[in-house]
């Protein structure tokens, strides 16, 4: 796990039931005790997402509340890649990657979770299990849950989401999976982002990235709550009022492609992390795979 040394250097290491953990020093004792309790009896902890055979998200409650994310890597090739850092990318769905991403962007933004610890079960040269400990956003609900309960809120909520996208870009990163379950609403109405397994650490082109975010957000989920023409109207109003310097020749083709068509995760990753791939996409957005 040498490729993570720069990220774990400031953390305190501890072995717990055969697992290696790196904890934020301020909370090491509390987190270590909570992790021990979880390892002994995971079934006694509340889940924060629908459990999957190899993945889970759990609530840990001590002096504070924490999120513990768990991921088991079933395939030897992925175990090898994550242990040795053979694929240093920001678009893979695993907790090693989310740890890397949040370590890169959390210092820039108050709207993302803070990393409290990272753990794994490994035997050279394979990592079998991953654990990620994060700060918990208490009394928040997802945009998805809010709109399921109150679909009529979409017209008031969407401009706030667009402003969150703009703030994200101004802070220099692009969340590649900005769907309504990954955006939380706080008790004061502020919005926050979670699930950073897929993230670009820099913004190649603001207008291109905003086109992706606003188009993808509709195609992935929000179309359940608002008609396409109504969504277009809200987008135009936001762009007119709050993005007067937007270059529409860049924004529009990207927005239209993501608004109405599915685009693979591989393509999303490549065009948001590589200037060369982004330029290629811009030349033929309608036909680019």
Regions found by a protein language model. Give the residues of each.
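Hydrophobic residue at the +6 position relative to the catalytic HRD Asp in the kinase catalytic loop
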Residues: 181-185
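Short beta-strand micro-motifs enriched in acidic
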Residues: 121, 186-188
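Conserved ATP-binding subdomain of kinase catalytic cores across diverse folds
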Residues: 38-137, 170
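Conserved kinase catalytic-core helix
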Residues: 94-95, 101-112, 144-179
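A short beta-strand motif that forms the metal-chelation/ATP-contact edge
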Residues: 130-135, 190-196
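Juxta-kinase regulatory segment immediately upstream of eukaryotic protein kinase catalytic domains
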Residues: 1-47
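C-lobe/activation-segment region of protein kinase-like
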Residues: 192-288
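Short acidic/His/Gly/Ser-rich catalytic and metal-binding motifs that mark active-site loops
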Residues: 75-80, 141-144, 194
């Amino acid at each position: 796990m040498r490729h993570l040394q720069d990220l774990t250097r400031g953390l305190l290491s501890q072995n717990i039931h055969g697992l290696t953990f790196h904890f934020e020093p301020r909370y090491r004792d509390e987190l270590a005790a909570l992790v021990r309790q979880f390892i002994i009896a995971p079934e006694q902890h509340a889940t924060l997402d629908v459990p999957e055979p190899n993945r889970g998200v759990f609530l840990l409650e001590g002096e504070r509340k924490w999120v513990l994310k768990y991921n088991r890597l079933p395939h030897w090739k992925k175990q090898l890649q994550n242990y040795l850092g053979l694929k240093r990318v920001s678009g893979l769905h695993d907790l090693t990657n989310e740890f890397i991403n949040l370590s890169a962007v959390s210092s820039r933004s108050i709207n993302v979770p803070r990393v409290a610890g990272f753990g794994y079960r490994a035997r050279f040269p394979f990592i079998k299990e991953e654990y990620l400990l994060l700060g918990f956003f208490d009394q928040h609900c997802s945009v998805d849950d809010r709109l399921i309960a109150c679909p009529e809120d979409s017209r008031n909520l969407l401009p706030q989401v667009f402003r969150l996208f703009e703030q994200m870009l101004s802070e220099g990163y692009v969340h590649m999976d900005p769907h309504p379950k990954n955006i939380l609403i706080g008790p004061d109405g502020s919005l926050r982002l979670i699930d950073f397994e897929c993230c670009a650490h820099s913004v190649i082109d603001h207008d291109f990235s905003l086109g992706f975010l606003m188009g993808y957000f509709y195609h992935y989920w929000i179309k359940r709550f608002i008609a396409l023409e109504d969504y277009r109207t809200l987008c135009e109003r936001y762009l007119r009022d709050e993005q007067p310097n937007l270059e529409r020749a860049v924004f529009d083709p990207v927005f239209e492609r993501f608004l109405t068509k599915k685009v693979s995760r591989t393509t999303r990753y490549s065009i948001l992390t590589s200037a060369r791939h982004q330029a290629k996409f811009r030349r033929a957005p309608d036909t680019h795979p």
